[in-house]
């Protein structure tokens, strides 16, 4: 279930199932060109990197992005034919993978305003539902998430802190949780362990970086 999940760095995630899906590829070390699907949560540099898209995409890769990024995609190297634009609440199915865009936004911060309609994703593949939160705080929308594996930001400043992310994990209670978005662009290297310690004996936390 969580063995298929790699956190390559920061919020750059790769999930391998019957499709290979990347989320927000960033600082990718190797050129793999193995992505069946790439999902981008929003257009900040550490989530939408043309250099890193080029390392993982191939001629058949499908790119999923927020509708608000439409004007930013002309240099993505992915044609409109292979691009899906989504807003929070939208659902689609690609090659047998169910993808739902869910809200991702800050409360009381200006970094990720709700009106931008940036997203996280609920992805169901091989009968497992993964939640990739994107850059978000705890809000009324994310409290409703139902998933098997939750990948949540824990680095604070632009997103939830480790303590807040642990609070959210207890609310939505996934079978496993993976901390992301710490130790580089934001947060401290120990934030992942802080998150894990707070959920000890409550939720299975898997440290992937």
Feature names for model-found ranges:
Residues 5-6, 77-93, 166, 170-209:
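Binuclear metal-ion centers of metallo-dependent hydrolases, dominated by the metallo-beta-lactamase
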Residues 23, 39-40, 100-104, 152, ...:
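Redox-cofactor binding/interface segments in oxidoreductases and associated redox assembly factors
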Residues 51-107, 119-121, 193:
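Portal/gating segments that form or line small-molecule/metal binding sites
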Residues 122-175, 179-188:
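Metallo-beta-lactamase
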Residues 1-33, 85-146, 160, 209:
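Core dinuclear metal-dependent hydrolase active-site scaffold
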């Amino acid at each position: 279930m969580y063995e298929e999940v790699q956190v390559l760095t920061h919020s750059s995630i790769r999930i391998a199932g019957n499709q290979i899906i990347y989320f927000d590829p960033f600082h990718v070390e190797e050129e793999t060109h193995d992505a069946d699907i790439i999902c981008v949560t929003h257009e900040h540099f550490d989530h939408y990197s043309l250099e890193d898209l080029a390392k993982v995409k191939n001629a058949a890769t499908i790119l999923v992005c927020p509708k608000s990024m439409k004007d930013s995609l002309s240099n993505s190297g992915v044609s409109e034919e292979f691009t899906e634009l989504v807003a929070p609440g939208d659902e689609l199915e690609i090659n047998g993978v169910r993808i739902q865009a869910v809200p991702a936004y800050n409360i009381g911060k200006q970094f990720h305003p709700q009106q931008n309609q940036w997203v996280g994703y609920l992805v169901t593949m091989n009968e497992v539902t993964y939640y990739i939160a994107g850059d978000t705080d705890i809000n009324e929308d994310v409290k409703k998430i139902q998933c098997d594996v939750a990948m949540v930001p824990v680095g604070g400043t632009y997103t939830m802190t480790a303590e807040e992310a642990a609070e959210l994990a207890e609310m939505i209670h996934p079978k496993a949780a993976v901390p992301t978005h710490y130790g580089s662009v934001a947060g401290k290297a120990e934030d992942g362990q802080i998150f894990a310690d707070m959920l000890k004996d409550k939720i299975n936390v898997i440290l992937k970086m």
